Every structure is written in structure tokens, then in C-alpha cells.
């Protein structure tokens, strides 16, 4: 007659342990101190500083086929369903274990608000070969092993879900940061477009006025155009390409009108000069005729 006992960790302080215990054999529970007490799935030694070297004992009673546990003067105590079995450094009376009980060895050690050393916390499952406890449904060893395999798969799936959830949160944070960056870039682009439109409207009246200048104000327009070409607006990064093209067109028109003005001035000057030359030719016969009349009248007197 034997029993299979399984300890499933509740706080990741150890790996699942499963061992077969025989009647009238005492199994020691304690802290890992040497090679002989190295933790394994088939013993009850743990790599935890909150356990004593000899912390507790566990055995199967051959008469009742019940599993019992007791504390053997541990410093941090043994707890069954959150009930301490004995005071510090004092042995306890045997305590019967049932499937589903929660067993804690030691207590959590804190440094301010942080856990420095974890207690060993486990849920107990017990199956006796050929018999079952009245507190649990009957199940064979094969079904117990199958259930344990299913539990391990569930734990693995849960850990995987936690990792996926963390990755999803990280991805959502990344998307939010990218969205903020795009919004900032869009706002900057809109602001630049508004500035370009503002400066284009501001400069258009001046450029339009230069497109068809009059001869009377040609020199004044030339001076204003020179000042405008050297103003900060001409080198402003907000002036659009269309505005620059319009300015070039106005400049070309201005040069054309200047050429026309100079041509007209040259023609006028040429006509004045021709008149000055010809007026003497026009007036000479007139004076000759007048002189002839005067002489003729004097002769007949």
C-alpha cells in the first residue's frame, strides 16, 4: 500500500513535486544545504532561505492510510490552510493532510515594501493506491497523472496569455506614440500652409502693382522694386514658388516697360531736334518775303 502526493506551487517558489510515499516511512522537509538535500521533483527539499534545514516531516499512516505532517522546531513555522502548527522553535502535533489543503513552509521576508525571500506555498493532492479519502472523489493513479499533465498545460497557457497581454499593451503604447507623432507633424504642416498662404496674399498686391507700371512713375516703381527685392520677405522660407514666379514675371514686364519708355523718350528727343533744325528753314522764306515787301513799299514812295 502506498500513496501518491503532489505539491503544486502557488507562488512559483519551486517546481511541481510528485512522490510516492510508503507507510511507516518518514519523509523530511527542509532547506537545501548539500548534495544530498538538492531539490528534485521526487523529494521534499526546497531552495528557500525561509525554511530551516530540518523544517517538517511527512508520513503515511499504515493503519488509517492517512497522510500526516508536523513541524520539527522550525523558525518560521509550518502552516496548513493558514493555521500555524506550532510556535517558533517548538515541535507540533501531527496534523492530517487532505487533498486540496494549502501548505505553507515559512513566511515571506520583506525589505521595506519588497519581498526579499518568498515562502514555499503549495496545494496538496493525495491519492492512495487501492483506496481513496472520504473527502475526495475516487480516482486512479492514471487519472491523477493525467490531471497533473492537464494542470501543467493550463499553467503554460496562462503564462503564455500573460506574455501576449504584455506584448499587446506594449504594441498599443507604441501605436499611441506613433499617432501622437503623426498628429504633431500634421499640425506643423497645417501651420506652415497657413503661413505660406498668409505671406502669398500679403505679397500679391505688391507684385500685381508691378505688373503694369506707368511711365510717369517708372523710376519710383524701380526704387520700390529694388527695396522689395532686398527685404526679408524675399528671403523668407514661407514665400511660395508661385509667388516667386509671379515676381519674376513682374520683373520681366517692368524691364519691357522701361525699354518702351526709353524708346519713346528717344523718339521724342529726335522729333524735338528735327523741329529745331527745320524751323529755320520754315521761317527763312517768311522773313525774305517780309523784307521784300518792305523794300518794295519804300521804293514806290
From Swiss-Prot:
Coiled coil listed as a keyword: no
Subcellular location per the Swiss-Prot or TrEMBL entry: Nucleus
Gene Ontology BP annotations: asymmetric protein localization to old mitotic spindle pole body; negative regulation of septation initiation signaling
Species name: Schizosaccharomyces pombe (strain 972 / ATCC 24843) (Fission yeast)
Domain FHA: 27-85
Database matches in PROSITE patterns: FHA_DOMAIN (PS50006)
UniProt xrefs under SMART domains: FHA (SM00240)
InterPro entries named in the record: Cent_Immune-Sig_Mod, FHA_dom, SMAD_FHA_dom_sf
Protein name: Uncharacterized protein C3H7.13
